[in-house]
Design a protein with these regions (language model features):
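Bacterial N-terminal signal peptides that target proteins for export
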Residues: 1-10
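Active-/binding-site microenvironments in catalytic and ligand-binding cores
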Residues: 24-338
Length: 338
């Protein structure tokens, strides 16, 4: 076992070295745009969250009502590909005679074995590239080690305290009489393979009389979250595809200078995609080319009900992102405050 572990470690380090030497020669100026915030930028679109933007967003808080946009993170939720997540409880302090001191103090702890892109999570800029080239023309092959990235880690992001804008795409499709739901959904949902267009986004904004402004985070409800909430029974169906952003819709959002976009599915963009020859092109458009963050597996059903009741599609968006050095993504906790 020790020999196998050693060989595995050697193989991993060797692969890193090969990647570094082979890919570090990339001329990323030819494949990825430069950041508008300068050649040293690793912050991306969160540069748009200025004190003035946060202060203006705080005006959205009228009653102090808090609605969660976060799915429970628990064993058994749908996971993409070979990703894993498992919790193990250590309750040694509860064993007979294990209490500490005269006051019989006991304790429990957890071991959390999980990849970072699980549950409601943020895709960082180091998650997606074009070949060796990542956000702001960074050649990633020479900026990684066995443990993490040395550039584009989550520690460079500004706090996500800004205005959120909610778009109920289910209502848009219902009003246009083009909703094709999935029979596995208990509530209306837009079926997989449906391309969300710029016209769809603008129709959704019109429902709440909202105009996007620089620094916003956009959250889109497709109803697909209902399959996530039926875990593990509907995990296969949840992972089989999704409605999502097409490339034109992504371009339109980029032009609005948003900070991030999140959907109630596992990839944000339409699956199956618009072209069989491309893999996750919207990810590259948003993250690699523009530093706009992606939030996946957002819980949108509660907010959809809230917006339907109040008619307000804007809110104070508060998302906690750990200062996780060198990580490509992370679980997040998101609250919508009105």
């Amino acid at each position: 076992m020790r020999l196998m572990s050693a060989l595995t470690g050697i193989a991993f380090v060797t692969s890193i070295a090969m990647a570094s030497s082979a890919l570090a020669q990339s001329d990323c100026t030819k494949t990825v745009p430069a950041s508008p915030w300068g050649k040293e930028d690793q912050t991306g679109a969160t540069n748009r969250i200025t004190p003035a933007v946060t202060k203006a967003a705080a005006a959205e808080i009228k009653e102090g009502k808090v609605t969660s946009l976060t799915n429970d993170l628990v064993d058994g939720v749908p996971l993409f590909g070979t990703r894993f997540s498992k919790t193990v409880l250590t309750a040694g302090g509860l064993a007979p005679g294990a209490g500490l001191g005269k006051n019989d103090l006991t304790y429990m702890e957890d071991t959390w074995l999980s990849q970072s892109h699980v549950g409601t999570h943020l895709d960082g800029m180091g998650h997606i590239g074009r070949g060796d080239c990542y956000y702001n023309q960074i050649a990633m092959g020479k900026n990684i080690n066995q443990n993490n990235m040395t550039k584009l880690g989550l520690e460079h992001l500004k706090p996500f305290q800004t205005r959120g804008v909610f778009i109920d795409m289910v209502k848009v499709y219902q009003q246009a009489n083009k909703l094709k739901s999935n029979p596995n959904c208990r509530t209306p949902c837009i079926d997989k393979g449906t391309v969300i267009t710029p016209d769809d986004l603008q129709a959704g904004l019109k429902l709440t009389n909202t105009t996007l402004r620089e620094g916003d985070v956009v959250i889109i409800h497709t109803g697909w979250v209902d399959l996530f909430l039926q875990h593990p029974a509907k995990n296969t169906e949840y992972n089989s595809g999704e409605a999502g952003l097409g490339k034109a819709a992504a371009k339109w959002l980029i032009d609005q200078k948003i900070v991030a976009v999140g959907l109630d599915n596992w990839a944000v963009e339409v699956i199956p995609g618009e072209s069989q020859d491309e893999a996750f092109p919207v990810h590259q458009m948003l993250l690699t080319d523009n530093g706009i963050h992606i939030i996946e597996n957002v819980r949108t059903d509660l907010m959809a009900a809230q917006v339907a009741s109040s008619g307000r599609g804007t809110f104070f968006f508060s998302m906690t992102v750990p200062k996780a050095v060198g990580l490509t993504g992370t679980f997040v906790a998101i609250d919508a405050i009105q």
